[in-house]
């Protein structure tokens, strides 16, 4: 085999390995991109303290769709709340395992309209981690959030 053929084989192997690495890394990189920019309605998470409250009141509606294969009851305690930009709010979701087995689930959250997602900041949320409910367990799960004051501009 000539040196040129060996170099071509090495190059092809390098390209294939690079493509595999890119495929493997694309999902976490896209997730990071969405969290940083708020792209596609993905909310940003933060630990920032409250700033001076805005005067505008915003109505936030909560939804709880569930995968048909997940044997849970899952719903927000209140269907909506009002919040002023910069004001931190705490709301709760309720979940109940309807089976006699341990069942785990993880919330996928989104904000619509999508252009508002970058202003919706979750401080703490059950949706950051997988939730496991024991047989027939009922639980209350908190969500703490605020709307960035930049939204009113």
From Swiss-Prot:
Q: Which residues lie on this side of the membrane: Cytoplasmic?
A: 1-8
MF terms in GO: copper ion binding
Q: Which SUPFAM superfamilies match?
A: Ctag/Cox11
Q: Which residues lie on this side of the membrane: Periplasmic?
A: 30-153
Query: Which residue ranges traverse the bilayer?
Result: 9-29
Gene Ontology annotations for the cellular component aspect, listed alphabetically: plasma membrane
* GO BP, one annotated term: respiratory chain complex IV assembly
- Please give the name of this protein: Cytochrome c oxidase assembly protein CtaG
Membrane protein topology class: Single-pass type II membrane protein
**Family membership:** Belongs to the COX11/CtaG family.
Q: Which UniProt keywords apply?
A: Cell inner membrane, Cell membrane, Copper, Membrane, Signal-anchor, Transmembrane, Transmembrane helix
Q: Where in the cell is it found?
A: Cell inner membrane
User: Native species of this protein?
Assistant: Ehrlichia ruminantium
Pfam families recorded for this chain? Answer: CtaG_Cox11
Function recorded in the entry? Exerts its effect at some terminal stage of cytochrome c oxidase synthesis, probably by being involved in the insertion of the copper B into subunit I.
InterPro entries in the record, alphabetically? CtaG/Cox11_dom_sf, Cyt_c_oxidase_assmbl_CtaG
């Amino acid at each position: 085999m000539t040196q040129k053929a060996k170099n071509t084989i090495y190059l092809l192997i390098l390209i294939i390995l690079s493509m595999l690495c890119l495929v493997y890394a694309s999902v976490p990189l896209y997730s990071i991109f969405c969290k940083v920019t708020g792209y596609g309605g993905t909310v940003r998470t933060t630990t920032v303290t409250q700033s001076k409250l805005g005067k505008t009141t915003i109505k936030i509606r909560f939804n709880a769709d569930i995968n048909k294969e997940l044997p849970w009851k899952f719903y927000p305690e209140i269907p909506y709340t009002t919040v002023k930009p910069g004001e931190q709010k705490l709301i709760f979701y309720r979940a109940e395992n309807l089976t006699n087995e341990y069942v785990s689930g993880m919330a996928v959250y989104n904000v619509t309209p999508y252009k508002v997602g970058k202003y919706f900041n979750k401080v703490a949320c059950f949706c950051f981690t997988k939730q496991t409910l024991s047989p027939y367990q009922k639980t209350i799960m908190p969500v703490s959030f605020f709307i960035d004051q930049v939204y009113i501009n």
